[in-house]
């Protein structure tokens, strides 16, 4: 039978967790999602390495990831003279959550050589914006990354005001859907499954970093093919 169960720690006192404890299970908490830098999240592979008695292999994988990440970060520092501005994400139920310099995505953007409105803010959380405030501060952003849309038409269907952004007008809109799973149900409809951006992307932030660099400064990585990212048609 099961002797231990791994959970993400959102609320250790929730009813489900209490039931697991009453059943005598040992609970292990994966706290990777709470880390605020890409390499700190990736380093959780060492936790799994220790659990599976593969610590040396886990350490080796992480050291390679770290080496590659720092290499591309340095490439940007050495090569980028004029940084491009970037907008990320999309409005959700009237609110747009945007990264600061102290968030996971914010750190990736800075390391890729991007600038954004909150890039000097050190709050350890994404900040809520109204659409109007996003438009005020990001209307002229060079690139829009992580759009929640499969194409530009869907982006307009979600909110016609999205056409007001410079990145929309200049065809610099991108999503993270390249490795998203979709299924067709028996009625012929499309069901959206998981997105490998939130799985492999956590373990391999160097790939996410390269995607962002490629979008911002394609000449820096001429042979690189986008891994998680797609340009909206």
Listing of model-derived features with the role each one plays in the protein:
Residues 207, 216-233:
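Extracellular/periplasmic juxtamembrane helices and adjacent flexible linkers that interface
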Residues 1-39, 51, 55-202, 232:
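Binding-cleft/active-site segments that stabilize strongly anionic ligands or cofactors
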Residues 195-211, 215-216:
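Flexible loop/turn connectors
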């Amino acid at each position: 039978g099961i002797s231990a169960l791994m959970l993400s720690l959102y609320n250790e006192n929730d009813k489900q967790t209490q039931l697991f404890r009453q059943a005598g299970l040992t609970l292990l908490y994966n706290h990777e999602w709470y880390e605020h830098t890409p390499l700190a999240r990736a380093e959780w592979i060492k936790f799994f390495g220790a659990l599976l008695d593969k610590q040396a292999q886990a350490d080796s994988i992480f050291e390679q990831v770290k080496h590659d990440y720092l290499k591309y970060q340095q490439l940007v520092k050495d090569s980028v003279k004029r940084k491009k501005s970037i907008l990320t994400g999309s409005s959700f139920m009237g609110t747009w959550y945007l990264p600061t310099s102290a968030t996971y995505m914010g750190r990736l953007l800075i390391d890729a050589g991007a600038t954004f409105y909150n890039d000097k803010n050190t709050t350890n959380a994404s900040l809520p914006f109204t659409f109007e405030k996003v438009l005020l501060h990001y209307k002229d952003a060079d690139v829009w990354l992580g759009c929640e849309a499969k194409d530009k038409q869907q982006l307009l269907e979600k909110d016609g005001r999205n056409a007001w952004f410079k990145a929309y007008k200049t065809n610099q809109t991108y999503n993270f859907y390249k490795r998203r799973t979709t299924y067709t149900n028996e009625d012929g409809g499309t069901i959206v499954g998981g997105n490998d951006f939130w799985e492999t992307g956590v373990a391999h932030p160097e790939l996410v970093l390269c995607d962002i660099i490629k979008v911002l400064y394609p000449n820096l990585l001429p042979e690189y093919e986008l891994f998680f990212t797609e340009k909206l048609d």
